[in-house]
Amino acid sequence: MASTMIPYTVNIKLAARTLTGTLNLQNKTAVDWGWQGLIAQGCHSSILIIDPNTAQTIQVLERHKANVVKVKWSRENYHHSLSSPYSLRLASADAAGKIIVWDVVSGMAHCEIQEHSKPIQDMDWLWAQDASRDLLLAVHPPNYIVLWNGDTGTKLWKKSYAENILSFSFDPFEPSNLALLTSEGIVFITDFSHSKPPGSGGKKVYIASPHSSPAHSKPAAAQPTGAKKALNKVKVLITNEKPTAEAVTLNDCLQLSYLPSKRNHMLLLYPREILILDLELSQTVGVVAIERSGVPFIQVIPCAQRDALYCLHENGCITLRVCRSTTPSPNETVTDPEQNSQELVYDLRSQCDAIRVTKTVRPYRVVICPVNENKAVLVVSDGRVMLWELKAHASKSSSNLSSGLPPLYSAVNFCGTPLRQNQKCIPDLSLNSMIGHSLIPGVDSPRPLADQKEVHLKFLLTGLLSGLPLPPFSLRMCPPLTTKNINHYQPLLAVGTSNGSVLVYNLTSGLLHKELSVHSCEVRGIEWISLTSFLSFATSVPNNLGLVRNELQHVDLRTGRCFAFRGERGNDEPAIEMIKVSHLKQYLVVVFRDKPLELWDVRTGTLLREMAKNFPTVTALEWSPSHNLKSLKKKQLAAREAMARQTTLADAEQSSVESSVISLLQDAESKSESSQGISAREHFVFTDTDGQVYHITVEGNTVKDGARIPPDGSMGSIACIAWKGDTLVLGDVDGNLNFWDLKARLSRGVPTHRGWVKKIRFAPGKGNQKLLVMYTDGAEVWDTKEVQMVSSIRVGRNVNYRILDIDWCTSDKVVLASDDGCVRVLEMAMKSASYRMDEQDLTDPVWCPYLLLPRAALTLKAFLLLQPWMDTFTMDITQVDYKEKDEIKGLIQEQLNSLSNDIKSVLQDPNLSLLQRCLLVSRLFGDESDLQFWTVASHYIQAFAQSAQSNESVPEGQAAASHLDICHDILCESSFFQGFQLERVRLQEVKRSSYEHTKKCADQLLLLGQTDRAVQLLLETSADNSSYYCDSLKACLVTTITSSGPSQSTIKLVATNMIANGKLAEGVQLLCLIDKAADACRYLQTYGEWTRAAWLAKVRLNAAEGSDVLKRWAEHLCSPQVNQKSKAMLVLLSLGCFQKVGEMLHSMRYFDRAALFIEACLKYGVMETNDDINKLVGAAFVDYAKLLRSIGLKQGAVHWASRAGEAGKQLLEDLSQTEGTGTESSPADDTDNSLVNIE
């Protein structure tokens, strides 16, 4: 360190970052929560990346020039490997029509897309990622949809529509379906594809405004049953005819979304109600209406894991509504029997606290965690981000009766498997582990199972991020880091705000360190007087005499204590213009607008001098960095040493004590450089209105006037001065800078042509002569040694914000406050503030495997998935044989350490099965494809294992407990799927309101085999209907069909003729009447109606026939033109074709998934052993071993190679040889040969 007494500045490494504030109205919809576990949020033209678990902003992306209007994380619905790694990819769109796809970790733009210059209305990544995982659909105003390749920025196709498009929603069950919400209604597209634009203009339907519905005109004092009945009358809201001009004012539908919890359902959101539509009938089957005094909706998010809705209301309250099961529970008294059967009811199950809404503070958007669906984040216009978590509490069974709601029960499974004895679990892991699935009458037992508890849901606020208040701001960085204060230094930035508070940020973390309410009006300036205290001043609005109330406060950060520095002074006087503290923090100058300046002693708080009335008006002022502290210290030291020598010394021991006393004195002296006993001489210079420079010396309480320098003719009125070493710089109102070299007695004027020089500041650090200059239209950095500009930013040229204040925060970083409400820490080059996330110093570690290098992320996954080579499961990466750089090992260990204790204890629990582990890890990684696969695989491996064990019937209630939820649609068990479809038709039937609807219901009933009910509907056709005769005959036919040969063959002949002549649906119906549903399915498949055929097979065919139909469908899904292999695999899993799935996984090179799947199948005994299977096992295990070797996990490689039998022998030899010679091939060399198929 420095040997001299005077400390010199050392540099501290701070990350470039942006502290953000209030949002712009255009940012309202710019927020998204990705499968990757992070939240992206638009703030003016920047994008914040927030980790919801630790409530930290971990990245800010800056490249947009206009306000960000949409952000969307890419989907993770594909198998991840070294070539398709886990990566943080985000698309953002702005108000000028630009879309940027980001690599979030590096903060770099991956590609930029521009089609038009109007704000992007909506945008989303395609969820089906088998063909490509890079496709992005965007709505370019007014009426275009464009499909982009988000990796290259290439336009694939563009399509225009007749009306203005407001937003769109993809069908989560069918990638070829898309619905557009337009200014006039809805357009349904059924031929969406990445290869070509939709062929037709889509099917248009118009929404009749729900305000004409009885829900809004019900009498105020109606009984609840009456209100419920009124809701039932909201029948049709969808018509194919365009409504008359007076009926359509403006489409006040706020949102349209497909329900991910059940196929072919959609919600429409209006301010006062949510309509649930069944799209097969274009019919309302449920309404969530707000009572007259209730708070209107802004937004709704439908869940996938349960039929539930998260709703955001105008007061910032988030409510969770869960669809009521249609099976009445045994102890439930049905108050309104009609209601129970007539529509879907969404019960309010939980709500969080509202916020205080004002003109400037209102809720903007809510997003929920897509992986677990049990956390919601609310974004408020003032920049606050509130994280609410849903918690389930088991309760006494009687408590629900008071609310009048049927009880909610807990889930039976944890990670897809019933809990074992003493098994650790996380009840709040996800929505489907908190509450059980919705019950289906006739399939599920209405009574809860033995281990199901009644639960209540509550929202808990678990995180809060708050932004800066509204600008303007004044900034001041604390004194710089020096060799003296290095041990206790914190890089603190004080931000004075318009409401009188001072926010102190720690720039290492970017987090708010203290918020102090100091003043009653806007803070005008701040000056630090030590590392832990500062002076700040504020001035009130002038009265009619032009006088104000001045507030000058002394603030101690350690205690939070504030006091008025000028005592009673301050009322009714001219405004303070500036305050300047001397270099050694001994003296303070206070400059007023129309009043002579005051000179104060900072240490004692006493007024040293109030200048005379004739004192010149000050336009700019700066303290000199030179002083006589050094020579004073030398004199003092000499005096002390003289005293010490006069003392007689008893022995040498005493002298050592004495010298330590002296050094203590010196230490004390240097620690308080401005200690009371010593007053060093300091100087300041100032200019008057004529540009004359004055020099004043202050020592103790004596003030001396020094030399005066006449004005420089080339300069205008001087606005600011900066002084460092031998360089003095003056800036004027005309944009001139004048550089004085005091040693060489030279001056040099430079016109910047940028107008008024508002502020100039020298950078800290010994010999650092960089100067930061602020103008009305931007800022520049100058090198005063070379007298040349280093960097520049200008409004309208390279930034779109105005700069309000400037300072240096380290010797090479500047901090700027701007009118978009942000404070930016930038490199000296003043370029974008995005940074590499892996170089950041975070206060709390963040769990996000996507931040790791691709190879390291896969290692972490393999490490968590299975450690069969260990006796116990460890969370310490150093305990396994892992060849990798220590730095990468360290990063992996940081990820492991950042997991919550709950998750760690579950992962280390010996009772956790392989299937549960695979499911849990896919949740932790936010791996959509893995989660889908393991949910279905785990369910059917266990189901087939169970039925193999007990060929006798499955015990009652057991099957019901474990069926897949209806969000898996055709993958569900047939009995459950059938029950759901019957229930659905019953709802449709109650809701029908026209002949069209009745006909559709009768058709569905015939396909489902419900002939009696169908006949009743057919006979309802009125005599004046053109179909009266036809329907009557059909009713007769249905009732008289016998199983006699001749009638069957006649009907079959008629049916096949009908199909051949283009009447497919009618022919299929006839075939179903004579129990020839298998033939019907074949015809449907021949004519390309694959999904309809699968549906019919599930509801009508026995297991063997149904299996044939579904296998053909799976083959079709694998064909190159369809390319939905991942869906085909799920279909095969539901049929128990485990060998086929194992072979597919292996041939698609999903080596990790293949090995773990085959291992699970062998464990549960659902793969019999034969030569083919042994060959598959060997190939899969050896390829997984090679993959593990390539990422450096040698122990794992040995384990799987040894499990591979003959196939693994060669690899085992290679592995033992590398062990013997001690040379391990580097992962990079090994990658290629690890991907060779072993057959």
Curated annotation (Swiss-Prot):
InterPro entries linked: WD40/YVTN_repeat-like_dom_sf, WD40_repeat_dom_sf, WD40_rpt, WDR11
Cross-referenced SUPFAM superfamilies: WD40 repeat-like
Main function: Involved in the Hedgehog (Hh) signaling pathway, is essential for normal ciliogenesis. Regulates the proteolytic processing of gli3 and cooperates with the transcription factor emx1 in the induction of downstream Hh pathway gene expression and gonadotropin-releasing hormone production. WDR11 complex facilitates the tethering of Adaptor protein-1 complex (AP-1)-derived vesicles.
Pfam families per UniProt: Beta-prop_WDR11_1st, Beta-prop_WDR11_2nd, TPR_WDR11
Keywords: Cell projection, Cytoplasm, Cytoplasmic vesicle, Cytoskeleton, Golgi apparatus, Nucleus, Phosphoprotein, Repeat, WD repeat
Effect of loss of the gene: Morpholino knockdown causes microphtalmia, microcephaly, melanocyte disorganization, curved body axis, motility defects and narrow trunk. Morphants also exhibit aberrant head cartilage formation and cranial-facial dysmorphology.
Biased composition (Polar residues): 1215-1226
GO biological process, one term: intracellular protein transport
GO cellular component, one term: cytoplasm
PANTHER family (UniProt xref): WD REPEAT-CONTAINING PROTEIN 11
Localization of this protein: Cytoplasm, Cytoskeleton, Cilium basal body; Cytoplasm; Nucleus; Cytoplasm, Cytoskeleton, Cilium axoneme
Self-association state and partner proteins as the record states: Component of the complex WDR11.
Keyword flag Transcription: no
Annotated protein name in UniProt: WD repeat-containing protein 11
WD repeats: 63-112, 115-158, 358-398, 476-515, 571-610, 713-750, 752-792, 798-836, 898-944
Biological source species: Danio rerio
Chain segments carrying region Disordered: 1213-1239
